[in-house]
């Protein structure tokens, strides 16, 4: 499975935030979508024209009592909200602390990022960034490269070990393996590691939720691990 950042499809497990709680086996329920008209009223969605892919935003670190309607209200300050959705655990029916918002235009989406990324809401700083469109050039090429569900995790705090790294990513799906790379002589962490998830969607979710998040004062980097090309014999 070759990964992109988050996709706008209601399938599989999805992104969660650093402070979010672990979900059993990555169970996810997509909350009811709130679609908003130009007048600001909630519509049933009939005759709805799909907005630009680039106008879709990932919103992380939400307070757990924020529902889709309240999420839409937060983004009203940036323009017309077309779709707002908070993601829920399908087993507990509890918010997973993140969601998605689609603005009417790309310009309004950019304004929303400027206004609301880092915005303090009930003691939690929101994470707002653009969700990569489908068919993004970030998709790894096929052919000589072997597909991978492995991600590189950089700029880790020095005291983060393999166990904590695995726990961090388990909030976003099933972790197949996790490893913090250590110095062979000293045994100390080298500040980076690798995590393998069980599916492409979980890789996408983890990247969207964790890349750039602050962990113990350090902004963690998360991206698809590069695969070495197969050797020809």
From Swiss-Prot:
PROSITE patterns: RRM
Biased composition (Polar residues): 1-16
Region Disordered: start-end pairs: 1-52
Keyword RNA-binding on entry: yes
GO biological process, one term: chloroplast rRNA processing
Subcellular location, record wording: Plastid, Chloroplast
One example GO MF annotation: mRNA binding
SUPFAM superfamilies in alphabetical order: RNA-binding domain, RBD
Keywords: Chloroplast, mRNA processing, Plastid, Repeat, Ribonucleoprotein, RNA-binding
Superkingdom to which the source organism belongs: Eukaryota
Start and end residues of each RRM domain: 55-133, 149-227
GO terms under cellular component: chloroplast thylakoid membrane; ribonucleoprotein complex
Disulfide bridge partners, by residue number: none
Short name of any one Pfam family annotated for the protein: RRM_1
Keyword Repeat attributed: yes
InterPro entries, per the entry: Euk_RNA-bind_prot, Nucleotide-bd_a/b_plait_sf, RBD_domain_sf, RRM2_NsCP33-like, RRM_dom
Function: Probably involved in the 3'-end processing of chloroplast mRNA's.
This protein's name: 28 kDa ribonucleoprotein, chloroplastic
Taxonomic source organism: Spinacia oleracea (Spinach)
Lineage: Eukaryota, Viridiplantae, Streptophyta, Embryophyta, Tracheophyta
